[in-house]
Regions:
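Conserved beta-strand scaffold positions in the cores of enzyme catalytic domains, especially
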Residues: 8, 34-35, 104, 128-133
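Long, charged, glycine-rich C-terminal linkers/tails
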Residues: 8-13, 36-45, 288-291
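Short glycine-rich substrate-engagement loop in P-loop NTPases that contacts/grips substrate
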Residues: 23-58
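P-loop NTPase catalytic core of nucleic-acid-dependent motor ATPases
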Residues: 1-33, 216
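Loop/turn-to-beta-strand initiation segments
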Residues: 55-58, 99-104
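Extended alpha-helical interface modules used as scaffolds for assembling large macromolecular complexes
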Residues: 51-54, 67, 74-89, 108-368
Length: 368
């Protein structure tokens, strides 16, 4: 109804924090939770069939760590994009791919980024706006819960599971009935909430952040409409407040509102210096040293702040997998690169009597 692409919310954190228990109340809206809860432990083809079976409903997948990390990134795209593989028919003709629309919930001890990193793969920005990582630590030392209602966290988790297995299935019918009878109200509510959520972002927010804000606005809109439908008995202001809080926590965890590629550039350059700061950078004040092999650049500690001077070859290595030019612009924008006017490289006089153009990175990048 609102034209928003599919997406998933991924609860990640240590074992026994209530991640799986959080799936049960959500699933109980649609039916018996144990019958509707699925595992990530499946092939991409298997999950395609599972997604199709949950078209226009909720899909819940437990334990992301059980899916092959080689397939995890592609599966994330597939689930959110709502389209399976294009296949050939019995006689070689093209078969139409399976299509669906859904929001999915996911749990796991690791994020999608960490899961892909376990085999040396880098998460893509498009995957991170389709699978939105949310910490299972609510900050109250009770896992996913921020209040226990007089119980300890473990008992509350068990209570939610038990109640969800006893009372289930009826709310979805009331919800769908309300939506079909009041479909004209849906988009105006969403547009108003969307406008408020986008207005809450800093002006410099990247499009990726705005897309995720739009998805949280959709969730908040669903909550407000469910209250109007008397499906939920919650204070209206609590719905928007909760969704805005999660959006802000997501922004905080990702490191800000800049594009993911720009943040990745800063992380990679910082990591490169941390790993190779002494072994591949020659101290400028002591002159040439044959001890440095595969030199990436020089260290200049003669000024008020330390500078790591990258040769273009060293810069390309430090920003491998990214655009070196875009990475330089990202560090310039963050204040970590000393430019020559608008140019990211500047000429530097070196002890070996050369004066090459180099990328001059401030040592303060290691402090943040």
């Amino acid at each position: 109804l609102c034209g928003v692409d599919g997406f998933g919310l991924h609860l990640y954190g240590a074992s026994s924090t209530g991640k799986t228990a959080a799936l049960y109340p959500a699933l109980s809206v649609w039916g018996e939770p144990n019958q509707l809860r699925h595992s990530w432990r499946a092939t991409a083809n298997g999950l395609e069939g599972t997604a199709l079976a949950h078209n226009d409903a909720l899909l819940a997948l437990d334990e992301m760590g059980e899916v092959d990390p080689k397939e995890a990134g592609d599966v994330a795209y597939m689930l959110a994009n709502g389209q399976g593989k294009t296949r050939a028919g019995k006689y070689g003709e093209m078969r139409l791919p399976a299509r669906w629309r859904l929001v999915f919930l996911s749990t796991g001890e690791v994020t999608l980024e960490s899961h892909l990193a376990s085999i040396g793969k880098r998460v893509k920005a498009g995957q991170q706006v389709r699978v939105i990582d949310l910490s299972a630590d609510a900050g109250a030392q009770m896992g996913v819960f921020n209040q226990s209602h007089g119980m300890n966290a473990a008992d509350l988790a068990d209570h939610l599971k038990q109640q969800s297995r006893q009372h289930y299935g009826s709310l979805a019918l009331d919800w769908l009935r309300y939506l079909t009878q009041h479909s004209a109200q849906v988009c105006p509510v969403f547009q108003n909430v969307r406008q408020r959520f986008l207005a809450s972002l800093p002006p410099e927010s990247d499009g990726q952040v705005r897309r995720v804000a739009e998805k949280f606005a959709l969730l908040a809109s669903a909550g407000l409409l469910a209250i109007q439908a008397k499906v939920l008995d919650w204070p209206a202001q609590s719905v928007e407040a909760a969704c805005l809080s999660q959006l802000n926590q997501w922004i905080l965890a990702r490191g800000g509102v800049a594009a993911n590629e720009d943040q990745q550039a800063i992380r990679q350059v910082r990591s490169f210096i941390e790993q190779h700061g002494e072994s591949r950078f020659t101290p400028k004040q002591t002159g040439y040293s044959s001890q440095v092999r595969q030199r990436a650049g020089w260290i200049d500690s003669t000024g008020p702040q330390t500078l790591y001077l990258f040769y273009p070859t060293g810069w390309r290595e430090a920003t491998e997998g990214l655009s070196p030019d875009r990475a330089a612009k990202a560090l310039m924008a963050a204040g970590y690169l000393v430019p020559d006017g608008n140019r990211p490289q500047r000429k530097v006089s070196l002890p070996d009597n050369t004066r090459p153009r180099m990328y001059c990175v401030k040592g303060s990048i290691l402090d943040d």
